[in-house]
UniProtKB/Swiss-Prot annotation:
GO terms for cellular component: nucleus
Record-listed N-acetylalanine modification sites: A2
Keyword check for Nucleus: yes
General function of this protein: The complex LTO1:YAE1 functions as a target specific adapter that probably recruits apo-ABCE1 to the cytosolic iron-sulfur protein assembly (CIA) complex machinery. May be required for biogenesis of the large ribosomal subunit and initiation of translation. May play a role in the regulation of proline metabolism and ROS production.
Cellular localisation: Nucleus
Native species: Mus musculus
Protein name: Protein LTO1 homolog
Keyword Cytoplasm appears in the UniProt entry: no
Annotated stretches, region: deca-GX3 motif: 22-58
Biological processes per GO annotation: protein maturation; ribosomal large subunit biogenesis; translational initiation
Subunit structure: Forms a complex with YAE1. Interacts with PYCR1 and PYCR2.
């Protein structure tokens, strides 16, 4: 009688067993696909931020050279803002995506860039497109 009961238990419990196995297979497949999708998203987002930071750096270095050649008292305030932007860019953690204040520092850099553009009376239009990124005036 005990053998018959074990056979019936296997039949009755098959639904639960198949449900558990299906759940486990789905979980493993979803986890691996999630890792791939997360990696792809991180690469795209990191490339956009890198392009933006590179554009700010090039902009700041170009204006540093331009303002240095015609250093007058009027340009001293502009030069201080350029130097502050360059300092922020140099301190930015390019190789640490887990840095706690990454977004705060990025917002600070963007604010300093806007301040510099205002002082220079320049209207930047930074765009990241599939064909590349650019800063237009």
């Amino acid at each position: 009688m005990a053998v018959e009961q074990d056979i019936f238990d296997a039949v009755v419990m098959a639904d639960e067993r198949f449900h558990g196995e299906g759940y486990q297979e789905g979980y493993e497949e979803g986890s691996s696909l999630g890792i791939v999708e997360g990696k792809r998203y991180g690469m795209v987002h990191g490339a956009k931020i890198g392009s933006e930071i590179g554009c700010y750096r090039g902009f700041a270095l170009a204006w540093k050279c331009l303002l240095h050649s015609g250093a007058g008292e009027k340009d001293s305030r502009k030069m201080k803002v350029v130097e502050a932007l360059i300092a922020l860019l140099q301190d930015f953690p390019y190789d640490d995506p887990t840095y706690e204040k990454l977004h705060e520092d990025l917002d600070r850099i963007r604010g300093k860039f806007r301040q510099l553009c205002s002082l220079l009376n320049v209207q930047p239009d930074f765009k990241v497109t599939p064909g590349g990124s650019g800063l237009a005036f």
